Amino acid sequence: MKLAPLLLLATLATSALNAQPENKPIRVAIVGLVHGHVKGFLAALPKNANAQLVAIVEPNTALAQQYASQYHLSQSLFDADLEHMLTSQHPDAVLVYTTIKDHRRVIEAAAKHNISSMVEKPLSTTMDDALAIRRAAREHHVQVLVNYETTWYSSNAEAISEAQSGKLGDVRKVVVHDGHEGPKEIGVGPEWLPWLTDPIQNGAGALFDFGCYGADLMTVLMHGQPPISVTAVTQTDKPATYPHVDDDATVILRYANAQAVLMPSWDWPFARKDMELYGATGYVITVASDNLRTRYHGEKSESQKTAPPLPENESNSLAYLAAVLHGEIKPQGDLTSLDTNIIVMQILDAARTSAKTGRTIELKPLPE
């Protein structure tokens, strides 16, 4: 006789859970319009239910007007002053499309308002700035995430999964190719090109612009362990076009039992972002965003396959950011997390020093 009331209570509890509303879209503000990747965000926003755009901070009124017209944005969204926007709107997160040099300034300002940040790769231009960003995140208990296009490639996720599951045996060598024909050659806009080719505002040329991708992937593959040493060679093959920065680099990362070769360049004949992982018993090569070439121990020839799709909340930057802010994902040790990207900056900083001095740089432990 007591079973029926219990069943009724269980049914009511289940109905109540099912009736709970879905997570509301996160409120985001764009800070800066000088990084061309903002165009991808604005183009995708109307189809993305994870976020609501509440403000855009851009002091260049002509550039702000250009974007307002191109993307049919209300003038009420725009603000020329960062602090005023943070105070008046208090978004859940800021999406930072400034120069890389400006990342620290924006992140620290947002953190003081307990607002999280997502920046475009890389995290910063210097190790000092990276550590200052980490201090701000810790002090104010906010998230700082770094957006890489390749994070949302299912091919990379599958390659990392196979490596970490032992399917390839011990990973011995990783080769990463990233880049394109050059920013000027592909038509980067006038608001972007000057600072992208400035060693102060961008940190370096192709070395930072595309070297960060491989450093990010390798740091996750090595479970957050930094390399023992970094050796880098850079050069400028097109000095008339890029007189102040490198346009081609090769970086060797040495680990206790593995080696990575990163090949960032603005001199590729076409755009590419691919990775080769070689283990003791197999290899996997990523092809574009969702395909792989593989060969495992005992197989006589190479095979091709499509990577399984990513979970919905890890399929793009906005879905991921919303999942983090809603507490569904803890960004620890993944491609986007701050701890991973502190190591990425350690690698890039050492690579820049190595290229400048002609010496291999042995990495020292970072302050906690």
Predicted regions and their residues:
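Bacterial N-terminal signal peptides
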Residues: 4-15
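Beta-strand-loop-alpha-helix segment that lines the small-molecule cofactor/substrate pocket
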Residues: 88, 93, 99-100, 104-151, ...
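N-terminal Rossmann-like dinucleotide-binding module
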Residues: 19-71
